[in-house]
Swiss-Prot record:
Gene3D superfamilies found in the cross-reference section: Single-stranded right-handed beta-helix, Pectin lyase-like
Main location: secreted
Organism whose genome encodes this protein: Aspergillus fumigatus (strain ATCC MYA-4609 / CBS 101355 / FGSC A1100 / Af293)
Catalytic residues of the enzyme: R205
Leader peptide range in chain numbering: 1-20
Alphabetical list of InterPro entries matching this protein: EF_Hand_1_Ca_BS, Pectin_lyas_fold, Pectin_lyase_fold/virulence, Polysaccharide_Lyase_1
Underlying gene: plyC
SUPFAM superfamilies the record matches: Pectin lyase-like
Record's protein name: Probable pectate lyase C
Ranges of residues in domain EF-hand: 262-297
Protein's job: Pectinolytic enzyme consist of four classes of enzymes: pectin lyase, polygalacturonase, pectin methylesterase and rhamnogalacturonase. Among pectinolytic enzymes, pectin lyase is the most important in depolymerization of pectin, since it cleaves internal glycosidic bonds of highly methylated pectins. Favors pectate, the anion, over pectin, the methyl ester.
Glycosylated position list: N49, N165, N202, N394
Length: 420
């Protein structure tokens, strides 16, 4: 979609009716109406193998699946995982400490209607050269919620090309590996919502934005000399809302929060805070609404009519929320625990890394014990009794009165559905 004026990037890009069922309770933004595998089949991941029956790679290799887990732990992969269309990945269903996928990256290119929740994607030094930890080149309607992504060799989390209606919310985008060390590109005219995320320890592109973007209540910590939020740096036209974010300098930070904008980048900005002094206290100030404070972008007087959050936090509230809940936070692993501790040092800790060994690698996870599931339909017997389904009949994909499958109703009950 080629944009010529802001009116073209309004809710028209968010074409579903406002009454459409959202991906899960709490889904927001451009990607809120992704359907995932709701009209397909359940696939239960039963092992930590790189491939083969019962593996995560096999689970996402076909369309129209809801993926749940009867195992927890670290899945070590050699090649990139390529995700098919209309796949839901519900990492919160894993027992123990959940799921980490380590060793290479993921492609969600053309993975229309993806829903991804509560999983860790950690690429690492041994991953494919010049590739992202999580990359999307094209595709429509995707939402990533409570995902921890780190150690990309090119970008860590990037969205490019003919991609549209995508949300990344409540997630951690961390530690792109040197020498590139990039948070990621967010450059599509089709609409990307970034809500309540943590960008941390990336030298540059935290993120770099072109096209249509809603950037609300994010925390950016310890960006390097390449820049924090990079505003287009392009002859192309961009239109963004930038609201209620907090930028906190760390040991690696040597430039201001916003860089490399120009008059082609049109930004509505409101209540963004900046703490540059690295003094061990969160004591930032509101950035004045001027082009010079926002990297030279053209400042707009009216907010773009994009799908917004239900509740806009203050920047301080966003920091409190992100440090408590962002990423695959049902159980925080050792990596995310270290990253959050860096943020809470308020400028005194953190660094750019070239090898994940600096963080102790992906760590170890308690695999837990899967609950009894007699019929193998993905819902534990005890939960089926509470739902009113039959523990002896494969009925998890039947629709509940809410419009979700019974499997989704159960999985959604395992984690919070609101953030305020």
């Amino acid at each position: 979609m080629k944009l010529s004026e802001p009116l073209l990037v309004s809710l028209a890009a968010f074409s579903q009716a406002v009454t459409a069922l959202v991906a899960f309770p709490g889904a927001e933004g451009f990607g809120a109406n992704a359907i995932g595998g709701r009209n397909g089949q359940v696939y239960v991941v039963t092992n930590l193998n790189d491939s083969g029956t019962g593996s995560l790679r096999d689970a996402v290799s076909a369309t129209d699946r809801i993926v749940v887990f009867a195992v927890g732990g670290v899945i070590k992969i050699s090649d990139r995982i390529v995700v098919s269309k209309r796949v839901t990945i519900l990492g919160q269903t894993a027992p123990g400490d959940g799921i980490t996928v380590y060793g290479n990256g993921w492609s969600f290119s053309n993975a229309d209607d993806a829903i991804v929740r509560y999983i860790r994607i950690r690429m690492g030094k041994g991953g494919s050269s010049g590739k992202d930890a999580l990359g999307i080149a094209e595709g429509n309607r995707m939402i990533f919620d409570h995902v921890s992504v780190s150690w990309g060799r090119d970008e860590t989390f990037s969205i490019n090309g003919d991609a549209s209606n995508i949300t990344v919310q409540n997630s951690i985008i961390a530690q792109g590996l040197e020498t590139h060390s990039c948070g990621g590109l967010m450059q599509t005219d089709g609409g990307v919502s970034l809500f309540r995320n943590l960008y941390i320890d990336n030298k540059t592109r935290n993120p770099k934005v072109k096209g249509v973007n809603e950037f609300t209540n994010n925390v950016v910590y310890n960006w390097g000399g390449g820049g924090g939020y990079i505003a287009g740096d392009s002859a192309g036209q961009s239109y963004a809302n930038i609201i209620g974010n907090y930028f906190i300098s760390g040991p690696s930070t040597s430039v201001t929060a916003f860089t490399r904008g120009n008059a082609n980048f049109h930004g509505y900005v409101q209540n963004n805070y900046y703490d540059p002094d690295k003094d061990g206290q969160l004591d930032g100030f509101e950035l004045g609404v001027s082009s010079s404070n926002y990297g030279g972008m053209a400042i707009m007087s009216s907010k773009y009519n994009y799908p917004a959050v239900a509740y806009t936090m203050s920047p301080a509230e966003a920091v409190t929320y992100v440090t408590k809940y962002a990423g695959a936070s049902k159980v925080r692993d050792s990596v995310d625990t270290q990253l959050i501790a860096q943020v809470q040092s308020w400028g005194t800790e953190g660094g750019l890394i070239s090898d994940e060994a600096t963080m102790g690698g992906p760590g170890t996870l308690n695999g837990g014990t899967p609950a009894k599931d007699t019929d193998g339909d993905g819902i534990p017997d005890e939960a089926e009794k509470q739902l009113g389904t039959d523990p002896n009949t494969n009925d998890s994909m039947k629709l509940h009165s809410s419009g979700y499958t019974y499997l989704e109703v159960w999985a959604n009950s395992l984690v919070p559905s609101t953030y305020h």
